[in-house]
């Protein structure tokens, strides 16, 4: 029975090309049961068979169906497209220029200054109200508390938790075309689950995968010394 339970082929990764560099059986994972009795041997074989079933199920879940097990160039539709991390830039602040922008520009929040007379009061005081398109109706005590940039805010005003002397611009870049070719380490782990190859030497030699031969060359995509 032990011969019917193969040792899985563990894939290795070729980082420069983003391809699988072949696979080999890892005999270090085999349990030594040479001096064990029939009961222990049966338990060991049960563990090995259960491990292989888990690997076969995992491969069925995460492996992308494809004709070529280890394609030389993965199409863009099958490659994970990773978005680069955003870049944050701190911009200088110019309070006077921002106030002028607030008073003369169209904006979604904030506004310009005008003097109004409150009911029951004989004095004129400064209030700030939005001009043009305004989605909020908040008042602030000082025009310096307004943030025309607002870190892309749509409503609200005032200093809140923002630093009035600091403005932050976030830049997000992306590729103009989807990437193709090699795959990354995360996708490699999902695509190349340890392979369970039953009866590897029972068929014709030409049917044995080149990737399982020890001297397989990932660059040449062939095994040295084999036609």
From Swiss-Prot:
A Pfam family this chain is assigned to: Adeno_PVIII
Please give the name of this protein. Pre-hexon-linking protein VIII
Additional record remark? All late proteins expressed from the major late promoter are produced by alternative splicing and alternative polyadenylation of the same gene giving rise to non-overlapping ORFs. A leader sequence is present in the N-terminus of all these mRNAs and is recognized by the viral shutoff protein to provide expression although conventional translation via ribosome scanning from the cap has been shut off in the host cell.
An example Gene Ontology CC term for this record:
host cell nucleus
Of which family is this protein a member?
A: Belongs to the adenoviridae hexon-linking protein family.
Protein source organism: Human adenovirus C serotype 2
Show the disulfide pairing.
none
Describe the subunit structure. Answer: Interacts with the peripentonal hexons as well as the hexons in the facets. Part of a complex composed of the core-capsid bridging protein, the endosome lysis protein VI and the hexon-linking protein VIII; these interactions bridge the virus core to the capsid.
Organism domain of life: Viruses
């Amino acid at each position: 029975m032990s011969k019917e339970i193969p040792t899985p082929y563990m894939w290795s990764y070729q980082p420069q090309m983003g391809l699988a560099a072949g696979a080999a059986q890892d005999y270090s994972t085999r349990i030594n049961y040479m001096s064990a009795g029939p009961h222990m041997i049966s338990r060991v074989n049960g563990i090995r068979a259960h491990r292989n079933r888990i690997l076969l199920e995992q491969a069925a879940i995460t492996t992308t169906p494809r004709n070529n097990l280890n394609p030389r160039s993965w199409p863009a539709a099958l490659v994970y497209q990773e978005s680069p991390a955003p870049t944050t830039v701190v911009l200088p602040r110019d309070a006077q220029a921002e106030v002028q922008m607030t008073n003369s520009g169209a904006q979604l929040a904030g506004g310009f200054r005008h003097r109004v007379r409150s009911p029951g009061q004989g004095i004129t005081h400064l209030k700030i109200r939005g001009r043009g398109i305004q989605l909020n109706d908040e008042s602030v005590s000082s025009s310096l508390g307004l943030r025309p940039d607002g870190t892309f805010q749509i409503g609200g005003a005032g200093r809140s938790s923002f630093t009035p002397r600091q403005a932050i611009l976030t830049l997000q870049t992306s590729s103009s075309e989807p990437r193709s070719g090699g795959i990354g380490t995360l996708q490699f782990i999902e695509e190349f689950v340890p392979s369970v190859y039953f009866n590897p030497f029972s068929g014709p030699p030409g049917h044995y995968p080149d990737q399982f031969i020890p001297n397989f060359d990932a660059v040449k995509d062939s095994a040295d010394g084999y036609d």
